[in-house]
Structure formats: structure tokens, C-alpha cells
Amino acid sequence: MTDTPDPAAVSSPAIKAAVLSEALPYIRRFHGKTIVVKYGGNAMTEERLQRSFAHDVVLLKLVGLNPVVVHGGGPQIDDALRRIGKQGTFVQGMRVTDAETMEVVEWVLGGQVQQDIVMMINEVGGKAVGLTGKDGMLIQARKKLMANKENPQEPIDIGFVGDITQVEPAVVKALQDDQFIPVISPIGYGEDGTAYNINADVVAGKMAEVLGAEKLLMMTNTPGVLDKSGKLLRSLSAQTIDELFADGTISGGMLPKIASSLDAAKNGVNSVHIVDGRVPHCLLLEILTDQGVGTMISSH
């Protein structure tokens, strides 16, 4: 039988020193590099995980990395919709967004959720600034039509949901240069000023590509990508992903997450990971330790 570790021993100065020593080569390797984090799931709704996330982001910035946060907010949007008597519906993992829902999305993501994240990071010593797609023309978009498997000639209209047409990273780079931590809401804007709801995983993937990020980390509510038996898949190739799409192993909200991760890997992001946001300090574990957590996505 294995003895239960003594908590005092685990938190001893020697253990802490060993952890710092393990992190040093990673700090050196990733110094000055951009790390894009898709922040969502339980990590956004449980206080201990919120604080863990904020501390991780601030520490990464303090040791010389450049974290960029792209946040979701699905549960918060659902709560706001319920208060006005609406229920959210989804097609292929994308939220159907009529005009009234779009107003709620803008208010929740660009206001309440974003400001909560900014304040949380600032309270633990960071300097965070909130952005939406409108700021500096950051995220330009057009209406998205979903593929209709039953009738390919008639795509599915899901309302004010957008496809990204262009990302202008200048405002993000300027904030990074001035030691700020950008916090980006996944709202894009069309040429006529129309606001579009864009899946946060898609925004995170595209932001990582355009910024030339070293790493893209997608936080989720599972240990990573699981096979049909519930076993964690430590790494996924492009071919394996196609197979998992085809047999339905990857479905629902995981579809845009994996598709965006694979696109990022194919377009120059050196390392893409699906990480378990329920694990405290999952960002530090993935970036600054030998072990890491979750599933690595490869374009090969």
C-alpha cells in the first residue's frame, strides 16, 4: 500500500526549489514568446480555479512570456438568456444567434465577463486590458453559414454568427510591448458595423496563427480528448483527428475546438494543447514542467 504524502513535506522548501529548477529551462526557452490561452469551462466559474488561472497568467508575464487570453462565456450567456425567457440552441457546436441573442452576447462577453477577468488579473498583480473585435479593427468578420450534410445545396443559417475574415494584431502587439495582458472577447464586426458572435475556440486559434504564437492552450472541462472508452489520448495527428470526426468520437462543442487547434498547428503555431481547466495551475503545468497535462495536437 502506498503511503499518503505528508502535505507539509510536499510543500517543503526543497520541493518548491525543485519545481522552480524544473521550470527554469522552459522559462529560458519561451522568454519573449507569445502564448495564447482559450479561457473557458469550469475554470471560469469556480473561484479557486479563477484565482489559479489569474496567478498563472500573471506569473507567465512576470517571467518574460507574453500571454494573450481569449475567453468564452457560454454558461454566463445561457444564464442571461434564461432571465429573459430564451433558451440557447446549437448547431454543430455553434450557438444559434438571433438579433436579441446577439445583444445579450455583446453585453455578457464584452461587458460582464471580460471585465471580471480583467479585474481578477489586475487584483493579483497583472496589468490586463479588455478588447473586442471592434478595438483597433482587431477581428473583422462576415456572416457564417453552416454546412448542411443532408442538403449541401442549402447551408444552415444560424443568425449573427461570424467567420473571421481578417485579424489586425497591431493593438495586441502594442499592449504586449507595454507589458499589458490582452483579454479578448470573441466578438467580430462586419464592414457595415454588424456585430457577430464568433466561437471563442476559433478566435483563439486564429489569434495564435496571426501573432505567431509559440503555444496555443485550449482549456476545457475534460482531461483532454478522450476516445470512445473514455481513455485520454495524449497526442493526435491530423489523420487521427479526421477519423475521430468521422466516427463521432469528437462531437458537439469539441468540434470547433479541435478543428481550430488543428488549423493553428498547420499554420505555424509550434505547440497546440487541449488542457484540463479543472486542474489548478494547469497553465504552469503545461508550459513550465516536463509532465504537462492534456492532449497535444499535431499537424503531421
Swiss-Prot record:
Gene3D superfamilies: Acetylglutamate kinase-like (3.40.1160.10). One of its GO terms (cellular component) is cytoplasm. Substrate binds at G73, G74, R95, N197. It is an enzyme of class 2 (transferase). InterPro entries: AceGlu_kinase-like_sf (IPR036393), AcgluKinase_fam (IPR004662), ArgB (IPR037528), Asp/Glu/Uridylate_kinase (IPR001048), Glu/AcGlu_kinase (IPR001057), NAGK-C (IPR041727). Pathway: Amino-acid biosynthesis; L-arginine biosynthesis; N(2)-acetyl-L-ornithine from L-glutamate: step 2/4. GO terms for molecular function: acetylglutamate kinase activity; ATP binding. It catalyses: N-acetyl-L-glutamate + ATP = N-acetyl-L-glutamyl 5-phosphate + ADP. Its EC number is 2.7.2.8. One of its GO terms (biological process) is L-arginine biosynthetic process. It is found in: Cytoplasm. Its main location: cytoplasm. Belongs to the acetylglutamate kinase family. ArgB subfamily. Catalyzes the ATP-dependent phosphorylation of N-acetyl-L-glutamate. HAMAP family: ArgB (MF_00082). This is Acetylglutamate kinase. The gene is argB.
